[in-house]
A protein has these predicted regions:
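Internal amphipathic alpha-helical repeat/solenoid segments
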Residues: 63-75, 96, 107
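Catalytic domains of carbohydrate-active enzymes, especially glycoside hydrolases
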Residues: 69-90, 301-307
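Short, flexible active-site loop motifs that bind/organize anionic cofactors or intermediates
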Residues: 60, 67, 98-101, 344
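A short acidic, glycine/proline-enriched capping/turn motif at secondary-structure boundaries
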Residues: 83, 92-94, 132-134
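Active-site mouth loops of central-metabolism enzymes
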Residues: 55-69, 146-149
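Glycine-rich, proline-tolerant flexible connector loops at the mouths of alpha/beta enzymes
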Residues: 89-103
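Active-site region of glycoside hydrolase catalytic domains
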Residues: 1-54, 97-99, 108-475
């Protein structure tokens, strides 16, 4: 009973949130490099600037200096007993603009060195190819994934990575949280598909168009990986938040179903190799006609090997009188679930919802799964003696790991591993803050760019080490 013997315990980061060194080693400018810092206290959102502008605050330029500290950090991960470490390969370290003929050797070597360091300690790298780090030149000069040329650029990048690291990396994912763009905002469109909205653009159409191109690119990458090395396992990565009806009222139940349809059709394409009927009917109603016969063939031949997903919270939705036939949701339909507590950022804490999500995937696809992000962001306080008592993080993770364990023991879920977010404090992707901390490892740096990037252990460090030692039996 319990977790499999080879369960992949570990942690997850993204290159743009931790590496820094934004102009070192031949790296080009990514879309994340032109996103400013935000502020949870004032409510100021991140802004997208037209290139790098002097005087603006771009936290991703420095991250937590993982580029220079990775050996120290991997040693700390090993001390906790990590079996896996998930990160991404920054596309612009390999192809600085995205359209070069040959890859950048300095960038390739950095990841060679990082993966070698992981293997030195018996840590399995788990790699995302595109984690909000698309080339800025792809956005500015090609229109991002609204342009079919982006498919070829991504597949070329993926093939270079598969060929170079095929004997160092077994587990891969294509596009991180590809379904975030279901909420059609400029922030989500630039992070997912390097799409810059112009005056007169139909944003919803562009979301579906660029997502389709990403799904085709993903399927081609899956097929290429299997041709390069049949042992490679390529998954999708879905941002998963179960959606509950706010009440038993039938309209609320249908609205929750509509939200699940709208937010999670992407995984249907990844896992089944074709679009679900409800999305095809939507395209028919709206006159969207961009799926070619060749695309259908590619999608059918490029199904993923496993489902990777993030889980932080659940949502509740209430029918507001809109879309009485389609029950398409809008973000304003989401309401507070009064049965749940929330973090300082308003993220509702629902460990049982994680078990619900595992079952939702399992019932539909019967594929292996990997939870590649789950964690608790908080304002951590470092005491005068250097300690950080983050019992709240331990409590959050303990309840979520128990939910995973129950899904395995009672529901028959095939769970490969859990790489929690994130083992070390990093820049928040949503708000661009340092002070939203997730790690077992405290990084001495803050929103005001004060600190020396020194690392120290929080209370949760030793707790997680014990969890791994006992394969989740002792929480």
């Amino acid at each position: 009973m319990g977790f499999r013997e080879d369960f992949l315990w570990g942690g997850a980061v993204a290159a743009h949130q931790c590496e820094g060194a934004w102009q070192e080693g031949g790296k080009g400018i990514s879309c994340s490099d032109v996103e400013t810092a935000g502020d949870n206290v004032t409510g100021a959102p991140r802004r997208l600037t037209d290139g790098v502008i002097e005087g603006e605050d771009y936290p991703n330029h420095v991250g937590v200096d993982f580029y220079h500290h990775y050996k120290e950090d991997v040693a700390l991960f090993a001390e906790m007993g990590f079996k896996a470490f998930r990160t991404s390969i920054a596309w612009t370290r390999i192809f600085p603009r995205g359209d070069e003929e040959k890859p950048n050797e300095d960038g390739l070597k950095f990841y060679d060195d990082l993966f070698d360091e992981c293997h030195k300690y018996g840590i399995e790298p788990v790699i995302t190819l595109s984690h909000f780090e698309l080339p800025w030149a792809l956005a500015k000069e090609y229109g991002g994934f609204r342009n079919r040329q982006a498919i070829d650029m991504f597949v070329k990048f993926a093939k270079v990575c598969f060929e170079r690291y095929q004997h160092k990396v077994k587990y891969w994912m294509t596009f991180n949280e590809i379904n975030n763009q279901a909420d059609v905002t400029q922030h989500n469109l630039i992070q997912e598909g390097a799409v810059l909205l112009q005056e007169g653009d139909d944003a919803e159409y562009l979301m579906y168009l660029s997502a389709h191109h990403e799904l085709v690119a993903s399927a081609l990458a899956v097929k290429a990986a299997h041709e390069i090395n049949p042992d490679l396992q390529v998954g999708c990565m879905i941002g998963m938040n179960g959606v509950y009806p706010a009440s038993p009222k039938p309209e609320d139940v249908m609205n929750a179903l509509g939200a699940m349809h709208q937010k999670y059709w992407y995984v249907e394409v990844h896992a089944r190799g074709h679009y679900p009927r409800h999305i095809l009917k939507k395209f028919e109603r709206k006159g969207y006609d961009f799926i070619t016969e060749e695309d259908k063939k590619i999608l059918a031949e490029g199904k993923v090997d496993y489902i990777g997903f993030s889980y932080y919270m659940s949502f509740a939705t209430k029918y507001q009188g809109r879309n009485e036939k389609t029950f398409d949701y809008v973000p304003e339909d989401f309401v507070r679930n009064t049965y749940l507590k929330a973090s300082d950022w308003g993220w509702q804490i629902d460990p049982l919802g994680l078990r619900w999500c595992l079952n939702w995937f399992n019932d539909r696809f019967e594929l292996p799964m990997m939870i590649v992000e789950n964690g608790f962001g908080a304002y951590d306080k470092k005491e005068a003696d250097g300690t950080v008592d983050d019992q709240y993080r331990i409590d959050y993770l303990k309840e979520h790991i128990q939910a995973m364990k129950d899904a395995v023991e009672y529901d028959g879920v095939d769970l490969l591993g859990d790489t929690m977010w994130s083992p070390i404090d990093i820049v928040s992707a949503s708000t661009g803050e340092y002070d939203k901390r997730y790690g077992f490892i405290y990084v001495n740096y803050n929103n005001n760019h004060e600190g020396d990037f020194s690392r120290s252990k929080k209370k949760s460090f030793d707790w997680y080490k014990h969890v791994i030692e006992t394969n989740g039996e002792k929480l």
